[in-house]
Amino acid sequence: MMSMEGPFLAAVIARLADPRFNLAAHGVAFAFALLIEAPVIMIMSASTALVEDRLSFKRLRAFIYGLNGIVTAFQLAILIPPVFRFIMLDLVAVPEEVADLAYWALWILLPWPGAIGYRRFFHGILIRDGRTRLVALGTGVRLVTMASTGLALFFFLQPPGAWVGAASLSLGVLAEAIVSRFMAESSVRKLLATEGVTADSVTGDRAGEELTYARIWRFYYPLALTSTIGLAAQPMMTFFMGRAIAPVESLAVFPVAVS
């Protein structure tokens, strides 16, 4: 279902003013948002594997809150105007018209990494509890919210297309995060009522041993590194296209092609 987001938003942006610049800015902003969220994207695997009682739930929840704060602060640092202009204009070398649109799109995408980490934490809890259908339901809520936001902005306000794409993605994932928390309520109650640690085929810890932050970090950092390396490809392609022939056209067609 999530694969429908890209083609839908590209179609909406292409029908608004200045589609060439806005498709390019949407692609640039989304590429950087993906890279920023990369460290939190594997939290679902961590919560599926590690959360088995009250203590492990609270420890991993605190860990993901801290990680969400770090990636959000990193995005805020990128949005400091001199830093942003250095990255976009000097390093990536995107045209200034594209950079200006991408700047505000990244502001609109500010809730994106934290909401991704939050909802994937609760997705893992749902999966561990065997309630996988609710994960699909949450994705459906995300798609409906994303599409409704995009269409409402298209028909009633018609802001720049890059901002429409960013707002649709942000509101969609925020809606999914909120719904996932409510859907996981009964699973969370069961975890909070469970004392002690049962064992662990995944981490290899001894039965009865607490899940410490050090163990969470040892388990999680290879996953975070894997997702960061994998998702770095799109920003790298943006870097090369910004310095290639016809950069605006290349940046505009790239999000359409990969969607």
Please tell me what each predicted stretch does.
Residues M1-M4, L106-L110, A136-G140, V179-F182, ...:
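Hydrophobic faces of transmembrane alpha-helices in multi-pass small-molecule transporters and flippases
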Residues S3-A24, L89-E96, F154-Q158, A224, ...:
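Helix-terminus/linker motif at the lipid-water interface of multi-pass membrane proteins
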Residues A25-L76, R119-I127, F254-S259:
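Small-residue-rich hydrophobic transmembrane alpha-helices
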Residues G27-F30, N68, L106-L109, P113, ...:
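Residue-level recognition of transmembrane alpha-helices
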Residues I41-T48, I108-I127, V135-R142, V164-R181:
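Short runs within selected transmembrane alpha-helices of multi-pass transporters and secretion channels
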Residues A73-Y103:
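Short membrane-interface helical motifs at transmembrane helix boundaries
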Residues E96-R119, S259:
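Alpha-helical transmembrane segments of multi-pass membrane proteins
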